[in-house]
């Protein structure tokens, strides 16, 4: 079995591995590693994490019997090898495409994916539930959560460790320690692992590690173990299987193992990538026309911080993605990467605000969900001046259900004292940043999407934008489109097309999602023209819903209004443009809906020839 690569596409399940010897397992590892590099070079994906767990995943499937034994992949981005070994190699050509193979574990995709993940630090709690259910039902199987050292900094993981150790039930926890999560890890837990990792690494005896952090919590600790030595990993897994009570195997791996550009990565660049050239390690990207939204926000933050020493920046383990590295270098004493700890980050920002500081809390929209109670209880309830940069707001595409930034408007809309905004271009982003740090009446959220910000070549502008004041881009006559952020361009194109047919459709930049521009809304409603709201977010509890509530509360009748947005469902992975088109969030969708509304109001005319 020295040439195993060609057989990868024929794998149906992991049972064949039981017949392989160590050399054959190592050959399998080499073939899988080559397959991963080739396939992700075309599709993109989480190549670094998966190259680091090739041998570990092979050892797990060799020692256990999936799906009877339950693997729970924390975060789940490192599950590609697991997918290959469970019969999905042939689908890797569709990885993260619309309708294709998911980049994370998916229960409907395979019986071997027993729990879906995407956010970090959830695996241990899920595993606790499974072992409790197993024992109540008097069943026999192993539960094996695989969690990284980065995810172990999350409070939820520590809560679960505390409970699992106290319960004393049989469970085998795999700690995949690669000294990185997305960015280099931080914190005391990271330091503890570092001491274990460097103390006679791979030669520790049980006697030498008595009293470790994990044993104090009630776990039997095995390690550190070389995660790229299949035989050593299997030996320790077999020992863990014979041990009663919770066991933690400390597996040391190298992120990006086997592909030099990924191995040498210290910034997290190779954590998740787009397509790349295998030979050179260079990324294949379309020509960049403008700065990213994250860069625009970060650069403005630096400019403001140069003038105001009260401004500090906080990120929960995303300094690279949120483009805060320059800020960290310029103001190291005012930059805080707290690790995967969104709840702590949010209340820490609240504490800073009580002392007159001006915290900028930057969190991806999908991860802001994790800090909801802290937003309500600690920030908004106390009306504290915290500026929240909601990065990756809207659809993010390939990462799918677990990462779409589509819920924040709905869950922030209901919180008193919260201001929510979203710029249409770079200049407006800078203006909203300036406005936010000049605002002294509570929390101020600025949403911005993934990708490039239009308007990069426009001159600097420091004009503050009055709270709740919208911008009329095209004066409405026959109908009006209310929208914000990236969908502004769709509305403008739709208005241009409709103008050619003789319809004068207004476009309003509703850059403040909360509060609404009530004065402008009254003015529009008095015109008695059709109103269309467009948003790249959930309709339930969204911007359009707020407009409807305003209309009802203001006792307007006979209003022709429609909302375009995302339905009440989790949105799967795929191209953002394809997803938007499928829900009518497109120029064509807007044009058709406006015509439908004009017909409903009796204002549709025959198309000009």
UniProtKB/Swiss-Prot annotation:
CDD domains attached to this UniProt entry: TPP_DXS, TPP_PYR_DXS_TK_like
- Name the reaction it catalyses: D-glyceraldehyde 3-phosphate + pyruvate + H(+) = 1-deoxy-D-xylulose 5-phosphate + CO2
Required cofactors, per record? Mg(2+); thiamine diphosphate
Binding positions (thiamine diphosphate) = 77, 118-120, 150-151, 178, 259, 342
The keyword Metal-binding appears for this protein? yes
Q: How does it assemble?
A: Homodimer.
Described purpose of this protein according to its UniProt entry: Catalyzes the acyloin condensation reaction between C atoms 2 and 3 of pyruvate and glyceraldehyde 3-phosphate to yield 1-deoxy-D-xylulose-5-phosphate (DXP).
Family in the record: Belongs to the transketolase family. DXPS subfamily.
Quote the protein name from its UniProt record. 1-deoxy-D-xylulose-5-phosphate synthase
What is the primary gene name for this protein?
dxs
């Amino acid at each position: 079995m020295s040439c195993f690569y060609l057989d990868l596409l024929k794998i149906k399940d992991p049972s064949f591995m039981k017949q392989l010897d160590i050399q054959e397992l190592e050959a399998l590892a080499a073939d899988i590693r080559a397959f991963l590099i080739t396939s992700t070079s075309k599709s993109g994906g989480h190549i670094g994490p998966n190259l680091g767990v090739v041998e570990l995943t092979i050892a797990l499937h060799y020692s256990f019997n999936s799906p009877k034994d339950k693997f729970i992949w924390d975060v789940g981005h490192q599950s590609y090898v697991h997918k290959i070994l469970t019969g999905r190699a042939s689908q890797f050509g569709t990885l993260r495409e619309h309708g294709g193979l998911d980049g994370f574990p998916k229960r409907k995709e395979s019986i071997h994916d027993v729990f879906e993940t995407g956010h970090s630090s959830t695996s241990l709690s899920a595993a606790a539930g499974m072992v409790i259910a197993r024992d109540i039902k008097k069943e026999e199987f192993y539960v094996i959560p695989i969690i990284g050292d980065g995810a172990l900094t999350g409070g939820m993981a520590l809560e679960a460790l505390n409970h699992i150790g106290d319960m004393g039930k049989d469970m085998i926890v795999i700690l995949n320690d690669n000294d990185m999560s997305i960015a280099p890890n931080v914190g005391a837990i990271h330091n503890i692992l570092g001491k274990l990792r460097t103390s006679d690494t791979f030669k520790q005896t049980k006697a030498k590690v008595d009293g470790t952090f994990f044993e104090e919590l009630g776990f039997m600790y095995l390690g550190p173990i070389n995660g790229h030595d299949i035989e050593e990993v299997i030996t320790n897994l077999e020992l863990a299987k014979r041990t009663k009570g919770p066991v933690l195997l400390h597996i040391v791996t190298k992120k990006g193992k086997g592909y030099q550009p990924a191995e040498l990565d210290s910034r997290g660049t190779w954590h998740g990538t787009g397509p790349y050239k295998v030979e050179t390690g260079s990324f294949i990207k379309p020509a960049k026309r403008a700065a990213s939204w994250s860069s625009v926000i970060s650069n403005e933050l630096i400019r403001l911080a140069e003038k105001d020493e009260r401004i500090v920046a906080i990120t929960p383990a995303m300094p690279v993605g949120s483009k805060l590295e320059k800020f960290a270098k310029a103001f190291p004493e005012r930059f805080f990467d707290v690790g995967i700890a969104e709840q702590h980050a949010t209340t820490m920002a609240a504490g800073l605000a009580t002392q007159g500081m001006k915290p900028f809390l930057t969190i991806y929209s999908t991860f802001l969900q994790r800090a909801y109670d802290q937003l309500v209880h600690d920030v908004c309830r106390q009306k504290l001046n915290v500026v929240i940069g909601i990065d990756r707001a809207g659809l993010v595409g390939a990462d799918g259900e677990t990462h779409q930034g589509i819920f924040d408007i709905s869950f922030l809309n209901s919180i008193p004292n919260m201001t929510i905004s979203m710029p249409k271009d770079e200049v407006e982003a800078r203006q909203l940043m300036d406005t936010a740090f000049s605002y002294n009446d509570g929390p101020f959220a600025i949403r911005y999407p993934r990708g490039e910000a239009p308007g990069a070549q426009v001159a600097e502008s420091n004009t503050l934008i009055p709270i709740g004041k919208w911008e009329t881009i095209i004066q409405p006559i026959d109908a009006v489109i209310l929208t914000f952020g990236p969908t502004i361009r769709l509305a403008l194109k739709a208005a241009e097309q409709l103008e050619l047919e003789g319809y004068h459709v207004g476009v309003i930049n509703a850059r403040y999602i909360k509060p609404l521009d009530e004065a402008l809304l009254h003015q529009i409603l008095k015109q008695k023209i059709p109103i269309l709201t467009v948003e790249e977010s959930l309709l339930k509890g969204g911007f359009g819903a707020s407009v409807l509530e305003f209309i009802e509360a203001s006792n307007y009748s006979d209003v022709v209004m429609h909302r375009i947005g995302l339905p009440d469902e989790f949105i799967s992975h795929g191209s953002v443009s394809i997803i938007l088109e499928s829900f009518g969030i497109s120029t064509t969708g807007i044009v058709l809906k406006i015509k439908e509304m004009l017909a409903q109001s009796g204002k549709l005319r025959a198309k000009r020839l």
